[in-house]
Amino acid sequence: MSKLGVVLFVFLLLLPLAAPQPVGDQPADQPADRNAEARARFLHPFQYYTLYRYLTRFLHRYPIYYIRY
């Protein structure tokens, strides 16, 4: 192996493996998790429109669901 190959091998493969892995429950990660939960509950206005479109297509395709008992 050439010197450049050894240097690339050390810096690109061995150093990332030896670096300490980040801990998942650090305080910096918690606000991002809360924001992800809030974004999961929020529907964009266009999503309401697509939901309405799918429901109207479904009800036109299967009119038996219009019947109320």
Curated annotation (Swiss-Prot):
Residues 1-20 form the signal peptide. Expressed by the venom duct. InterPro entries: Conotoxin (IPR004214). GO terms for cellular component: extracellular region; host cell postsynaptic membrane. Residues 21-69 form a propeptide. It comes from the Eukaryota. Transmembrane segments: none annotated. Keywords: Ion channel impairing toxin, Ionotropic glutamate receptor inhibitor, Neurotoxin, Postsynaptic neurotoxin, Potassium channel impairing toxin, Secreted, Signal, Toxin, Voltage-gated potassium channel impairing toxin, Voltage-gated sodium channel impairing toxin. GO terms for molecular function: ion channel inhibitor activity; potassium channel regulator activity; sodium channel regulator activity; toxin activity. Its main location: secreted. Coiled coil: none annotated. The keyword Nucleotide-binding does not apply. It holds the Pfam family Conotoxin. The mature peptide does not contain cysteine residues. Tyrosine-rich conopeptide that targets several channels/receptors that are expressed in Xenopus oocytes. These targets are the voltage-gated potassium channels Kv1.6/KCNA6 (IC(50) is 170 nM) and Kv1.2/KCNA2 (IC(50) is 2.0 uM), Nav1.2/SCN2A (30% of inhibition), and N-methyl-D-aspartate (NMDA) receptor (GRIN1/GRIN2A/GRIN3B and GRIN1/GRIN2B/GRIN3B) (15% of inhibition). In vivo, causes the marine worm N.virens to move very slowly in contrast to control worms, and causes seizures (at 5 nmol) and death (20 nmol) to mice when intracranially injected. This is Conopeptide Y-Pl1.
